[in-house]
């Protein structure tokens, strides 16, 4: 081997021993005739000292520059008093170098690694192989590896089998657009890259494998946000003969053990909350419980007021009128309120009403707001009592369609929690349960809230009679307002699966065409089964404190779903297109 140790492995126990290191020159310093090189490798850094007594080695050290790849042999020695570097794992020792081989030279990097500052993300992604040399980036990928190792170990110990499922499959309606792959041997036909291994893992349960897992690549051609990538990694789990409480208990144990092993954090039992309660209190099905602010419904106090902005939604069963109290917010300037008004507009809110509570003892005179003159004093007091308002608070209001108010004030709740530093703890895991089976569209049609294979908490007949009120056997694990994973008990009877398809507007012919293999499988003794899938990238993002999942993926795509390093996607030549039976249509230019 070319090295005896990694830099991060060196410590005082090796004092006096000869070591050989291989790595990159992170920093070079010349201090009065003595040259110091900070050598960096995957595991950390070490300081190497070269003195002029060894003329040939000293001259070689004098020639090296940042990012040269070197092999160094020397003797470990303790650093002098006052020279210990507490910020470096090997900071108590240094190596007296007496042999240096330059394995490769390096041009000046496009951005400095040792004084990293405001480098644009596109530049970082263009030179990702340089960006990943930075210790903080390498630390994230090392932690990612520890996370996957911990998860694999837990699942292996609990009897799960790691089974790979196909990457080339057929398109099925799962919500997002598929990435399509043209077939050369079947002209005019296309494979689809999987959005998840959902159907294959269910078929593995039908086949009797009982406990399956896979750390799987998944693909979705969708609009990208901070927590989305066109290709992402999923921790995919499926079991037979367990109900939802048992699956939730098992996967919760996995996450608790993971945080203990990797971050030395102890979690207690995760609280459970229904979807209805989460939406009512927090305006979100993935509430951040670290923030002690809640939405409070006040429609009953505003049904008869002479103020249509409130009275209209208060009397509409599809709408919601909600208050959100911010303690100590009465001193907020109008410019800040305008900023928050613009913010909730992103979610469809037409405005943001408010009341500043200056001095409740003075009645209406002690309240500052353009809306108080439209609401009877008794109703105002009832509202302020209900939200717990005291002098110095501000109360915001939302009145609109249920979804608009929930999303707008739910997002405002999060924004206020961070802007005013209200977080009560660092970590807040939880479960959300009892999701609706379907989301009703404006035209009266239905969309599956999770996916079409989720089992309901009722019979097929009850489901078809009352689809809008049916609850599913679905469950989501949420951490700090981020959905870590979602799962459900699956449909294992053909009649129920056909009923769900019908409610989604998928008639018998289309069912057979797109899902015939699944319906066939359900005829041949499918066991009760269910599972859960975690987003690995999101999990690593949370555990490393990264701001985006792009920070925890080795080679991510940009927000426009492109790789600036490899220039993918790229054009292909005409011959390759002909073999795939594809002809590109010329785009007409708009004058």
UniProtKB/Swiss-Prot annotation:
GO CC terms: cytoplasm
UniProt KW Glycoprotein keyword: no
Name this protein carries in UniProt: Aspartate--tRNA(Asp/Asn) ligase
Example GO BP: aspartyl-tRNA aminoacylation
UniProt cross-references to InterPro entries, sorted A to Z: Aa-tRNA-synt_II (IPR004364), aa-tRNA-synth_II (IPR006195), aa-tRNA-synth_II/BPL/LPL (IPR045864), Asp-tRNA-ligase_1 (IPR004524), Asp-tRNA-ligase_1_N (IPR047089), Asp/Asn-tRNA-synth_IIb (IPR002312), AspRS_core (IPR047090), GAD-like_sf (IPR004115)
Organism: Pseudomonas putida (strain ATCC 47054 / DSM 6125 / CFBP 8728 / NCIMB 11950 / KT2440)
Function: Aspartyl-tRNA synthetase with relaxed tRNA specificity since it is able to aspartylate not only its cognate tRNA(Asp) but also tRNA(Asn). Reaction proceeds in two steps: L-aspartate is first activated by ATP to form Asp-AMP and then transferred to the acceptor end of tRNA(Asp/Asn).
Assembly with partners or alone: Homodimer.
Main location: cytoplasm
UniProt-annotated site: Important for tRNA non-discrimination, residues: 31, 82
Family assignment from sequence similarity: Belongs to the class-II aminoacyl-tRNA synthetase family. Type 1 subfamily.
Residue segments, region Aspartate: 198-201
């Amino acid at each position: 081997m070319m090295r005896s140790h990694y830099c991060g492995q060196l410590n005082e126990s090796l004092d006096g021993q000869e070591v050989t290191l291989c790595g990159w020159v992170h920093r070079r310093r010349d201090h009065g005739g003595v040259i110091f090189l900070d050598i960096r490798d995957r595991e950390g850094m070490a300081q190497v000292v070269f003195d002029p007594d060894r003329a040939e080695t000293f001259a070689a050290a004098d020639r090296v520059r940042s990012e040269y790849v070197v092999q160094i042999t020397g003797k470990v020695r303790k650093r002098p008093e006052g020279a210990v570097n507490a910020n470096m794992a090997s900071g108590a020792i240094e190596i007296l170098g007496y042999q240096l081989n330059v394995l490769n030279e390096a041009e000046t990097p496009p951005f400095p690694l040792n004084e990293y500052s405001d480098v644009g993300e596109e530049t970082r992604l263009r030179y990702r192989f340089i960006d990943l040399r930075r210790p903080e980036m390498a630390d994230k990928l090392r932690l990612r590896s520890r996370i996957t190792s911990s998860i694999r170990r837990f699942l292996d110990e609990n009897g799960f089998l790691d089974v790979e499922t196909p990457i080339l499959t057929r398109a099925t309606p799962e919500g997002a657009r598929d990435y399509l792959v043209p077939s050369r041997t079947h002209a005019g036909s296309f494979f689809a890259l999987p959005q998840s291994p959902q159907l294959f893992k269910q078929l593995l349960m039908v086949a009797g494998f009982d406990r399956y897992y896979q750390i799987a690549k998944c693909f979705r051609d969708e609009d990208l946000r901070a927590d989305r990538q066109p290709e992402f990694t999923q921790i995919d789990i499926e079991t037979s003969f367990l109900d939802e409480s048992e699956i939730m208990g098992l996967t919760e144990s996995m996450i608790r053990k993971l945080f203990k092993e990797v971050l030395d954090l102890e979690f207690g039992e995760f609280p459970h909350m229904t979807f209805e309660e989460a939406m009512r209190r927090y305006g979100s099905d993935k509430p951040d419980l670290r923030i002690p602010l809640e939405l409070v419904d006040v429609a009953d106090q505003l049904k008869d007021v002479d103020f249509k902005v409130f009275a209209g939604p208060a009397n509409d069963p599809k709408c919601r009128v909600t208050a959100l109290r911010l303690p100590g917010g009465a001193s907020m300037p109008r410019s800040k309120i305008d900023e928050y008004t613009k913010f909730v507009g992103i979610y469809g809110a037409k405005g943001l009403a408010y009341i500043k509570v200056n001095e409740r003892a003075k009645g209406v005179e002690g309240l500052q707001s353009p809306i108080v003159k439209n609401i009877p004093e008794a109703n105002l007091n009832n509202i302020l009592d209900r939200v717990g308002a005291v002098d110095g608070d501000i109360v915001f209001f939302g009145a609109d369609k249920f979804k608009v108010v929930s999303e707008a004030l739910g997002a405002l709740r999060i924004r206020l929690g961070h802007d005013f530093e209200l977080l009560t703890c660092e970590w807040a895991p939880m479960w959300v349960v009892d999701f609706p089976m379907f989301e009703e569209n404006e035209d009266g049609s239905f969309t599956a809230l999770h996916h079409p294979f989720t089992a309901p908490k009722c019979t097929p007949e009850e489901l078809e009679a009352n689809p809008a009120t049916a609850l599913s056997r679905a469950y989501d694990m949420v951490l700090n307002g981020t959905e870590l994973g979602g799962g459900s008990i699956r449909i294992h009877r053909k009649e129920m699966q056909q009923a769900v398809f019908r409610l989604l507007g998928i008639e018998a012919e289309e069912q057979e065409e797109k899902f015939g293999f699944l319906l066939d499988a359900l005829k041949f003794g499918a066991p009760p089964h269910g599972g859960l899938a975690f987003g690995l990238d999101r999990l690593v993002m949370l555990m490393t404190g990264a701001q985006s999942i792009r920070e925890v993926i080795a080679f991510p795509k940009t927000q426009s779903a492109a790789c600036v390093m490899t220039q993918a996607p790229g054009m292909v030549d005409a011959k390759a297109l002909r073999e795939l039976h594809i002809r590109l249509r010329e785009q007409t230019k708009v004058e």
